[in-house]
Regions:
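Conserved donor-binding/catalytic core segment of Leloir-type glycosyltransferases
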Residues: 5-6, 145, 182-208, 217, ...
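Nucleotide-sugar-dependent
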Residues: 11-14, 199, 250-254, 262-282, ...
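Donor nucleotide-sugar binding/catalytic pocket of nucleotide-sugar-dependent glycosyltransferases
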Residues: 35, 131-178, 242
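Nucleotide-sugar donor phosphate/pyrophosphate-binding loop at the beta->alpha transition
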Residues: 65-69, 103-106, 115-136, 173-175, ...
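Membrane-proximal helix-turn-helix segments that form the acceptor-binding/catalytic region
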Residues: 69-76, 94, 98-102, 109, ...
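Nucleotide-activated donor-binding/catalytic signature segment of Leloir-type glycosyltransferases, i.e.
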Residues: 226-254
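Conserved acidic donor-binding segment of nucleotide-sugar-dependent glycosyltransferases
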Residues: 305-316, 323-330
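A charged, aromatic-enriched C-terminal amphipathic alpha-helix characteristic of glycosyltransferases
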Residues: 316, 327-361
């Protein structure tokens, strides 16, 4: 059975799509992945064929329609009656939906987030366009999965649909990588991810004034990097706040396990953030690093269930909660982190994907 997977990115850093493709490929599905050249064409290898559609548009508002038109043509060329379409996020859905209807083949929609509630489009005209598209297609879908329990509840309630299958974007399980005899002379507080607004970084940098004998490492790049570098300099915190830039996945894993606490301190700037389970939380947990997180539904549930760190209800609590975790130390959380790592891993999510695709196959072939 052929599965044509499409996503609006250059494929290189999309871990969810890579894991889903690998899971399906290892289960015997014939996978082909289609992305684009938005963000460059980094070299990569995969055990299944992939291609990247060339986009001429320089702005996203033009790139989205260009991609969907070219994707529509590409899918028509590659699909046959023994094909399942797998559309990732709303920005690939129109092309997939039209091909699905034209060829009478099944479509699975994987919504990694609530696209229409992303902070980047909040209050903009483009948000209205995406909402119209979402409202038109999502209620017609028979097979859908999404990345958090709260997302699934939102889609079911908003569109009156059967609750989507929840496939959390957890990392592959790793054995405890910690060497507890290695102790940082200065404690390491870690943030990994894009340096965007609403990630709480502009609150954490000043909070470092109240945290002694520690450094704040920011791993990633993004539109707010220069502003946060300037803030660090203005506060005279260059010795306590380090910008490590965008790292290769292996280097990031090596740095993550050195951390004494990992942060996921998003601000409530839209439902997509509020209902998310950020990848970095489970990445920290697999590295056996305790966490400080915003008390949003999904992250809060992890702390309540596994006791792997602290929650903040306000960014005013940052220094206090980070200091609690640092004073307790990593060994204090070892048992809880090992238990959480066994549950919050990709191996627990794979059966849900395979069950969904078995359902698609049984109903259509």
């Amino acid at each position: 059975m052929k599965v044509l997977v499409s996503v609006f990115n250059n494929l290189y850093t999309d871990q969810r799509v890579e894991k889903v493709c690998r899971t399906l490929s290892e289960a015997g599905y014939d996978i082909e992945l289609i992305g684009n050249n938005w963000g460059g064409l980094p070299e990569m290898q995969r055990p299944y064929p992939f291609s990247r559609i060339s986009l001429k548009s320089k702005s996203l508002k033009l790139a989205y329609p260009e991609f969907n038109w070219k994707l529509y043509q590409e899918l028509l060329k590659k699909a046959d009656k023994n094909t399942i379409l797998l559309s990732n996020d709303l920005d690939t859905l129109l092309a997939n939906y039209l091909v699905s209807k034209k060829l009478s083949i099944p479509l699975v929609f994987d919504s990694h987030e609530i696209f229409t509630e992303m902070p980047a489009i909040n209050g903009r005209f483009t948000q209205k366009i995406w909402r119209i598209l979402e409202k038109f297609i999502v209620p017609k879908l028979k097979f859908m999965m999404t990345a958090s329990e709260s997302y699934a509840d939102w889609f079911a309630k908003t569109y009156g649909i059967e609750r989507p299958t929840v496939v959390q974007n957890f990392p592959v399980k790793i054995e405890n990588p910690q060497n507890y005899s290695e102790i940082n002379l200065k404690k390491v507080i870690l943030y990994q991810g894009v340096i965007n607004p609403s990630r709480g970084l502009n609150k954490m940098i000043p909070a470092m004034e109240k945290i002694e004998n520690a450094e704040f490492w920011i791993c990633g790049d993004g539109p707010k990097k220069e502003a946060y570098l300037a803030l660090t300099k203005t506060l005279g915190l260059q010795e306590k706040v380090k910008f490590l830039g965008k790292l290769l996945p292996k280097n990031l894993r090596d740095i993550t396990k050195k951390a004494d606490v990992g942060l996921s301190i998003e601000e409530n700037n839209g439902l997509s953030y509020f209902y998310s389970m950020p990848n970095k939380v489970s990445d920290y947990i697999q590295a056996r690093v305790p966490v400080v997180v915003s008390n949003f539904p999904e992250m809060g549930k992890v702390i309540d269930r596994f006791q792997v760190g602290e929650k903040i209800n306000s960014h005013n609590e940052l220094a206090e909660k980070v200091n609690i975790v640092l004073e307790r130390g990593k060994i204090f959380y070892e048992y809880a982190l090992n238990k959480a790592a066994t549950e919050l891993c990709w191996e627990k999510e794979e059966p849900k994907i395979l069950a969904l695709f078995r359902k698609v196959t049984q109903k259509h072939f």
